[in-house]
Amino acid sequence: MRSRGVKYVSVRARLARSRVLAYLALTKPRVIELLLVTAIPAMLLADRGSANPLLILNTLLGGISAAAGANTFNCVADADIDKLMKRTSRRPLARAAVPPRNALVLGLALTAGSFFWLWWTTNLLSGLLALATVAFYVFVYTLLLKRRTSQNVVWGGAAGCMPVMIGWSAITDTIGWPALAMFAIIFFWTPPHTWALAMRYKDDYKVASVPMLPAVATERHVTKQILIYTWLTALSTLVLALATGWLYMAVAVVAGAWFLTMAHQLYVGVCAGEPVKPLRLFLQSNNYLAVVFCALAVDSVLALPTLF
């Protein structure tokens, strides 16, 4: 009897753990990492490294909640196509691990919680920016652009740029030009980052009838666009140097040259008809963004004198 009872409790524990992990997966934790990588340096730059740690923590909690809410809504809206794509077929709603209604409630709770938390702990502007981010990601990108245009990630990617705006506004209660410069960096970085991954999974997008650029254009055209946006990314990091010290400037130049080299190699390889590995660019683009923004954070904490 005791053994049977222990097994019953063990099964219930596993089911509970599986259910919790399914709800957590709805929020796409790995996507939220971008928030941490970009929001903290933005806040440090806004206060030249002397930002209140509690304010940073409160802003991150609100921002994470907003991102989690947006990702949850995205899973609900994309459940039909997630079932068709190998890369996303194991997502909770695609495999019916979570009822859609429960996912909607979770998304609403996270979004509302984010707004009120940021309003209470930082300022109204930050709360409104978080609310606008969720609305833009869900209604403009997910519902309007994603299934209608190959430029979906170009314009829809603006939602991923908002953490720096929220971080900056949490410190200053304004939107200054450095925040816009950081916004531009992430805006131009998003297409090459996303298209490199989409090149690897373009057949998935074709099956799901999602007009991601690699699924509807030639590899030559896609890699040319990747190269153009990589150049724009590297150049936009130099604009931010007007508000930073020599450390950020040096890292931005070196990292930009490295990122451009990888994009050029991908384009040249495709033009030459050689086998290419776009997934490598996707993975390294994450490292590039992390390096640039970490350099920004260190530069700000050290309060190095601005170059201009």
From Swiss-Prot:
Cellular localisation: Cell membrane
Lipid bilayer topology: Multi-pass membrane protein
Superkingdom assignment: Bacteria
UniProt catalytic activity: heme b + (2E,6E)-farnesyl diphosphate + H2O = Fe(II)-heme o + diphosphate
Coiled coil: none
Protein keywords: Cell membrane, Heme biosynthesis, Membrane, Transferase, Transmembrane, Transmembrane helix
GO molecular function: protoheme IX farnesyltransferase activity
Record GO biological process: heme O biosynthetic process
GO CC field: plasma membrane
Pathway of action: Porphyrin-containing compound metabolism; heme O biosynthesis; heme O from protoheme: step 1/1
Membrane-spanning intervals of the chain: 20-40, 53-73, 102-122, 124-144, 149-169, 170-190, 227-249, 254-276, 288-308
Gene3D superfamilies listed in its UniProt record: UbiA prenyltransferase
Class of enzymatic activity (EC top level): transferase
The enzyme's E.C. designation: 2.5.1.141
Family from the record: Belongs to the UbiA prenyltransferase family. Protoheme IX farnesyltransferase subfamily.
Summary of the function given for this chain in its UniProt record: Converts heme B (protoheme IX) to heme O by substitution of the vinyl group on carbon 2 of heme B porphyrin ring with a hydroxyethyl farnesyl side group.
Additional remarks: Carbon 2 of the heme B porphyrin ring is defined according to the Fischer nomenclature.
HAMAP family from the UniProt entry: CyoE_CtaB
Protein name: Protoheme IX farnesyltransferase
Organism of this sequence: Mycobacterium leprae (strain TN)
